[in-house]
From Swiss-Prot:
<feature type="modified residue" description="Phosphoserine">
    <location>
        <position position="132"/>
    </location>
</feature>
<feature type="modified residue" description="N6-acetyllysine">
    <location>
        <position position="24"/>
    </location>
</feature>
<dbReference type="GO" id="GO:0048471">
    <property type="term" value="C:perinuclear region of cytoplasm"/>
</dbReference>
<dbReference type="GO" id="GO:0005911">
    <property type="term" value="C:cell-cell junction"/>
</dbReference>
<keyword id="KW-0496">Mitochondrion</keyword>
<dbReference type="InterPro" id="IPR040079">
    <property type="entry name" value="Glutathione_S-Trfase"/>
</dbReference>
<feature type="modified residue" description="Phosphotyrosine">
    <location>
        <position position="244"/>
    </location>
</feature>
<dbReference type="Pfam" id="PF13410">
    <property type="entry name" value="GST_C_2"/>
</dbReference>
<keyword id="KW-0868">Chloride</keyword>
<dbReference type="GO" id="GO:0005902">
    <property type="term" value="C:microvillus"/>
</dbReference>
<dbReference type="GO" id="GO:0034707">
    <property type="term" value="C:chloride channel complex"/>
</dbReference>
<dbReference type="GO" id="GO:0006821">
    <property type="term" value="P:chloride transport"/>
</dbReference>
<keyword id="KW-0851">Voltage-gated channel</keyword>
<protein>
    <recommendedName>
        <fullName>Chloride intracellular channel protein 4</fullName>
        <ecNumber>1.8.-.-</ecNumber>
    </recommendedName>
</protein>
<feature type="modified residue" description="Phosphoserine">
    <location>
        <position position="4"/>
    </location>
</feature>
<feature type="modified residue" description="Phosphoserine">
    <location>
        <position position="236"/>
    </location>
</feature>
<dbReference type="GO" id="GO:0016363">
    <property type="term" value="C:nuclear matrix"/>
</dbReference>
Amino acid sequence: MALSMPLNGLKEEDKEPLIELFVKAGSDGESIGNCPFSQRLFMILWLKGVVFSVTTVDLKRKPADLQNLAPGTHPPFITFNSEVKTDVNKIEEFLEEVLCPPKYLKLSPKHPESNTAGMDIFAKFSAYIKNSRPEANEALERGLLKTLQKLDEYLNSPLPDEIDENSMEDIKFSTRRFLDGDEMTLADCNLLPKLHIVKVVAKKYRNFDIPKGMTGIWRYLTNAYSRDEFTNTCPSDKEVEIAYSDVAKRLTK
C-alpha cells in the first residue's frame, strides 16, 4: 500500500517528506490487523493529504530489518525522513506541528471537549468483554451503556458555532457529522477506531448492540463509514473478531 510522487525539480521546502507508517498485520500476515493505534496514525496521515507508504508488520515473523529499525518496538511507528518515531501520542503532536497549513490541513479540534468525548468507553468495554462471571455482566453492561450515553449526549448537543445568536430559531439538536464539526479531527482519529471495535466485538461475543435510540452515535458512525479515511484504514470485522477471540471471556457459571 505505497503511495509515491516524483520529487524531481522541486525546491527543498516543496518536497514531500519521506514517511513510512508501520502497522500491525492481520492474521494472514499481510492485511491490516486490529490495532486502534495503528488506524489512528493511518487516518491522521491520510487526512493530512501527505504522500506516505504503509507496511504491515507480522508480529509472528517480524523481519530482521525491522528489528534493527526499531528494536523492541511493536507497531505502530513511523519513519519521517529516516528518523524513527515510536510514541503514538508524540507522533500525533509531531505530525500536527510539521505537517501544517497552508500546505497541510490542521486537524486539532476547535473545542477542547471534543478531545475527551468518549474517552472512558474503551476501558468500560474492556472490563465488560473480559468478564467471565454472569452475575457481574449486567452491572458491567450498564457501565458501558452509561459511557455510550454520555458520548451520545455530546454528539447531539449543538456546538457553539452551530448556534446562530442572531437567529430566532432555537437549535436543540446538533446535526454535525463528527465530534468537532463536519470535518474529521485528531479526536475522531483517536475515538472512531475504538468505537468500531466496541460495536463489532460486543455484538459478536455478548450479542450487545449500541442502542438505536443513541441517534448521535449512529449518525457519527454512519458518517464515518462513508469516508475512505476511515473505511480504508479499518481492519475487517473478521480481523477484529479474531483479535478478541482469546480476550473475550465466555460467561460461565
